[in-house]
From Swiss-Prot:
Stretch forming the signal peptide: 1-29
Binding site for Mo-bis(molybdopterin guanine dinucleotide): 85, 152, 177, 181, 214-221, 245-249, 264-266, 374, 378, 484, 510-511, 533, 560, 718-727, 802, 819
Enzyme's top EC category: oxidoreductase
Cofactor(s) required, per the database record: [4Fe-4S] cluster; Mo-bis(molybdopterin guanine dinucleotide)
Quaternary context: Component of the periplasmic nitrate reductase NapAB complex composed of NapA and NapB.
Cofactor note: Binds 1 [4Fe-4S] cluster.
Protein name as it appears in the record: Periplasmic nitrate reductase
SUPFAM superfamilies: ADC-like, Formate dehydrogenase/DMSO reductase, domains 1-3
Binding site for [4Fe-4S] cluster: C48, C51, C55, C83
Family: Belongs to the prokaryotic molybdopterin-containing oxidoreductase family. NasA/NapA/NarB subfamily.
Chain sites annotated for binding substrate: F794
Length: 829
């Protein structure tokens, strides 16, 4: 066989590299290297499938399969970098137990609640599913059905789901798993600014003089963003990094000062900083007088528990979000009690360190970026805590300018773009609209071409309330999509599993893998993943990114979008709408929900010829469904402060940060000259509020619902580790990631271990009144809790640690507190 000089050089280079690595190439390997037709890899862009950072990756496909991924060097978010999970994206779709066909619990050839899973056709799956939905609707009306979605849905999938539930079934019982991670951030944005999502952007990392992490281990949870902080800190000696947490973790390694505080005492620390700013005459009066109002939050609001729970019954103002007007003097008097002495006593942080932190906020010459994730949001006073940090930035005027940014980070790839912007929460509609507002409902009904009164005005059941309703039998048909709540959610044994196994209920789980949730369900629908479909995500800095389908899915798996739309064909309008509503739109008689919701002249406006050839969803519908859904959804936000670019634009760029007006993205919102919605001459314009002013909201320290006792003497905190993402559905199927961290461990202080006769690697029983788990202890390594607290990650399906978590929530946001519950720890003999 002849070999060209070029091929000879390439082959020798490969052989040399192999020799260095200790590998012997067979003689025929030179042929493989030289034959470009057989080794050609096709590359295209896509946002990463994991966290809310929104890194762009280049995806390499060959012979219909993803074979490689790499960081996208043209991406402004990650600039070519990936984290360890991102580098193994090519393997997440190819786990050995990938689901390829629908599975239904069967006995004697028919569905049976206690039957074994058996393969069925999609038609059979939807026949049984539709029968159960119709029975639930007949029994309890629209509130008898529910849906639990995801911040991992694409924008189009979430939007289609909102239409299916709120307009089709006329049920607001739809909520995303982002309720567990971002609801408190949303609540505080809406209360403080009247509009959701961060005012700053990632460019702030290159401008800030000080970084303050409030309950965020960015080194492991947002590692690419952490590289930008690291670069800023190491390149500019004046820059300071501050890390606040209830335990020591990897982010402390870069910190100039680390602050380990008692659980829940962050409320006291934030109020102390506000008091320090006032007492040291560091208030930016020009900003405060022109751009803020003061409010008092209602206190003693309970813990979002069942109404008959003693803790809930004891609250003076359960679940109240009411606020009253106060003056600056009232606010000053209220925070005055949070002296450095009191804050130090409550938190366990030294007075010197507290003052050091407060000075960085108070100094007008120091630009401060505050960052937080679950440590602040998963908190029974999470909305308050978010607001208290906004108070600090508003008092000093350190907001909406480069480097001055209170920044709520997100954990899922489209918790912002889908859960929040699309409005898949039980109380929301797209673009910050809410179902309780008749004007907002009218806007949605007009865009969707529906008769007035279609959308019900009462918010539906949120995530935790859905569990309770399933257990109580008031929701009987339930669809879980793109999440693993049986592992991730709180209080599994008491409140969730009983509802799934309630014989009156029918539970459907759409997932690519047999998760804990899937195995507890009655019907499992196999789902297409990531670039097996076309979609769009929205990241933490308001950046919307789109991607094309790049490979076909496996077996009979279908996208969530296809499943939603196909299921809608099983219902006529007469079966889901009352006669009174039908009388307003007689032209819809005899039509299916699919006809009314998805073939309405908007969604089906763009022909199939505009789509890429490889687009299974578009081919199935006969029109460019992703573009149609996106453009109809975008109509909600245009001229409303949430402007999106035309859909086709997103395929040409590495994302754009909304609002996008006249083709230009917005970096800093609310700032004149940067935000097109900020009025000329305003300086700052918080236009989410009618008067353009943000709120400084006074809220005190209030204790958590449970504290350690003689019997349950340790705090338990649950969370994540670098190598795994959430419940490990994808990462535990990547061999390299699984081998790196195969098991969840109980990280414990050596003194606490010694007091219990424990050595590193011993198996322990962690228990409280909600359940127990067995896990091995770790006294060294990346996570080092203080005495009295243990940390256990929740990625390990064999150790369902979240079964111990109380289903207490922030009463305002309905978000669960995973960061503090009492347990006892004993050695397994």
């Amino acid at each position: 066989m002849k070999m060209t000089r070029r091929a000879f050089v390439k082959a020798n280079a490969a052989a040399s590299a192999a020799a260095v690595a200790g590998v012997t190439l067979p003689a025929t390997a030179t042929n493989l290297i030289a034959s470009s037709d057989q080794t050609k890899i096709t590359w295209d862009k896509a946002p990463c499938r994991f966290c809310g950072t929104g890194c762009s990756v280049l995806v390499g496909t060959q012979n219909g399969k993803v074979v490689a991924t790499q960081g996208d060097p043209e991406a402004p978010v990650n600039k070519g970098l990936n984290c360890i999970k991102g580098y193994f994206l090519s393997k997440i779709m190819y786990g050995k137990d990938r689901l390829e066909q629908p599975l239904l619990r069967m006995k004697d050839g028919e569905f049976h609640k206690d039957g074994d899973f058996a393969p069925v056709s999609w038609d059979k799956a939807f026949d049984v599913m539709a029968e159960k939905w119709k029975a639930a609707l007949k029994k309890n009306g629209p509130t008898g059905v529910g849906m639990f979605g995801s911040g991992q849905w694409t924008v189009m999938e979430g939007y289609a789901a909102v239409k299916l539930m709120k307009a089709g079934f006329r049920s607001n019982n739809i909520d995303p798993n982002a309720r567990h991670c971002m609801a408190s951030a949303v609540g505080a944005f809406m209360r403080t600014f009247g509009i959701d999502e961060p005012m700053g952007c990632y460019d702030d990392f290159e401008h800030a003089d000080a970084f303050v992490l409030w309950g965020s281990n960015m080194a492991e949870m947002h590692p690419v963003l952490w590289t930008r902080i690291t670069d800023r800190r190491l390149s500019h000696p004046h820059v300071k990094v501050n890390v606040l947490s209830t335990y020591y973790h990897r982010s402390f390694e870069l910190a100039d000062t680390g602050y380990i505080f008692e659980p829940q005492s962050d409320l006291a620390i934030a109020n102390f900083i506000a008091n320090y700013i006032i007492q040291n005459d560091a208030v930016n009066w020009e900003f405060v007088n022109k751009h803020t109002n003061f409010k008092q939050a209602t206190t003693d609001i309970g813990y979002g528990l069942r109404d008959n729970d003693p803790l809930q019954k004891a609250a003076a103002n359960p679940n109240s979000g009411k606020m009253t007007d106060i003056s600056f003097e009232d606010y000053k008097a209220s925070v005055a009690e949070y002296t450095v002495e009191k804050a130090s006593e409550m938190s366990g942080v030294s007075q010197d360190d507290l003052i050091k932190l407060a000075k960085q906020y108070a100094d007008p010459n120091i630009k401060v970026m505050s960052l937080w994730t679950m440590g602040m949001n998963q908190h029974t006073r999470g909305v308050w805590m978010n607001s208290l940090v906004y108070n600090i930035h508003l008092l000093t005027g350190k907001i909406s300018t480069p480097g001055n940014s209170p920044f709520s980070l997100t954990g899922q790839p489209s918790a912002c773009g889908t859960a929040r912007e699309v409005g898949t929460f039980s109380h929301r509609l797209p673009a910050d609209m809410v179902v309780a507002n008749p004007k907002h409902r009218k806007i949605a009904e007009d865009i969707w071409k529906l008769p007035e009164g279609t959308i019900p005005p009462k918010p539906g059941k949120h995530a935790v309330a859905q569990d309770r309703a399933l257990k109580d039998g008031t929701i009987n048909a339930y669809w879980v999509m793109c999440n693993n709540n049986m592992q991730a959610g709180p209080n599994i044994n008491t409140e969730r599993l009983p509802g799934y196994r309630n014989p009156d209920n029918f539970i459907v789980c759409s997932d690519p893998y047999p998760t804990a949730t899937a195995q507890a369900s009655d019907l499992i629908l196999p789902t297409a993943m990531w670039i097996e479909k076309e979609g769009a995500y929205g990241n933490a800095e308001r950046r919307t990114q789109a991607w094309y389908q790049q490979v076909k899915t496996v077996g009979e798996a279908k996208s969530d979008l296809w499943q939603i739309m196909e299921f809608s064909k099983r219902f006529t309008v007469e079966e889901v709408w009352g006669e009174e509503l039908l009388a307003k739109a007689p032209e819809y008689r005899g039509k299916t929900m699919y006809d009314v919701l998805y073939k309405n002249g908007n969604v089906d406006a763009f022909p199939l010829s505009e789509a890429q050839e490889l687009n299974d969803d578009a081919q199935a519908q006969g029109f460019y469904v992703q573009k149609g859904l996106f453009e109809e959804y975008a109509a909600f936000g245009r001229d409303h402060g949430h402007d999106l670019a035309p859909y086709d634009t997103y395929h040409k760029v590495r994302g754009l940060r909304w609002p996008v007006v006249d083709g230009k993205e917005t970096l800093w919102r609310f700032k004149e000259g940067s935000d097109p919605y900020a009025k000329k001459g305003s300086g700052w314009d918080f236009y989410g509020k009618p008067d353009g002013k943000a709120l400084i909201i006074n809220a005190p320290y209030e204790a958590p619902p449970e504290v350690p006792s003689d019997e349950y003497d340790m705090w338990l905190c649950t969370g994540r580790v670098l190598e795994h993402w959430h419940t490990g559905t994808m990462t535990r199927r990547v061999p390299e990631l699984y081998k790196a961290v195969p098991d969840a461990l109980c990280y414990i202080h050596p003194a606490d271990a010694k007091a219990r006769g424990l050595r590193r690697g011993d198996e322990v029983l962690i228990e409280n009144k909600r359940g127990e788990v067995r896990v091995r202890v770790e006294t060294r390594g990346r996570n080092r809790p203080p005495q009295g607290l243990v940390f256990v990650p929740f990625f390990d399906a064999r150790i369902l640690i979240n079964k111990l978590i109380l289903d207490a929530t922030d009463p305002l946001s309905k978000q669960t507190d995973y960061k503090k519950c009492p347990v006892k720890i004993t050695k397994v003999s």
